[in-house]
């Protein structure tokens, strides 16, 4: 929503739809979601039809691959090119290795992974609401790094933005579920994870 884009901008972030894939101890963690990224980061500068892939490996560090890949023309061109190459036999192993050489990996939930997050709550502007919200954070062991309350007297509600310290994804989701069921909530809460780079 526009309010989240504006809030992100004020906090020094941009919102990007990012995909992540990590291999840790033979376990694959994959996720795709909107992410708050610092405006100063490289990935924040990728706009328009450009896409980027950042590979972080040991000992080489980060490698960046960037090119056109969004929008109807760029996407169609890339798909037709890849399919043509595979059909012509130019790409023998589309996944870089033969099917026999592939090994089975375990896919893991991100519930136990830790993230810093941006949460926004639209609530009735009345006494006790803020303390009720912060108590739910405390009960779920989610530490608040920053809290911003923007009252809107004409509509008698308030927008509360919370930035958290690193917390378990499972705990962040519990906070959202417990708060959204409260009678003082006027709109579904928003959660956006914050990227580290």
Spans of model-derived segments:
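Glycine-rich phosphate/pyrophosphate-binding beta-alpha loops
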Residues: 61-63, 67-73
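A conserved regulatory-domain signal marking ACT and ACT-like small-molecule sensing domains
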Residues: 78, 83-197
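Substrate-binding/catalytic subdomain of NAD(P)-dependent oxidoreductase enzymes
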Residues: 1-45, 50
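A short, polar/proline- and glycine-enriched secondary-structure boundary/capping micro-motif
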Residues: 43, 74-78
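A glycine- and small/hydrophobic-rich beta-loop-beta segment
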Residues: 52, 58-60, 93-94
